[in-house]
């Protein structure tokens, strides 16, 4: 699978916690972040699908306060 680079701004506390987790799991920070993003996206998959057109008339669906637009 082709990979792209993404730059993140994280707090010092988040970096410290990420480094501890890296040590415990013996994997890279990138591997931990990839796994976390994949898990997050998987959890969001159902609400996004529902928001794209599966709603019942008058039903309100909140996907994520950070999700502004979903594109195919």
UniProtKB/Swiss-Prot annotation:
GO terms for molecular function: sequence-specific DNA binding. It comes from the Bacteria. Residues 51-72 are annotated as: Disordered. InterPro entries: Arc_rbn_hlx_hlx, CopG. GO terms for biological process: regulation of DNA-templated transcription. Belongs to the YiiE family. This is Uncharacterized protein YiiE. It comes from Escherichia coli O6:K15:H31 (strain 536 / UPEC).
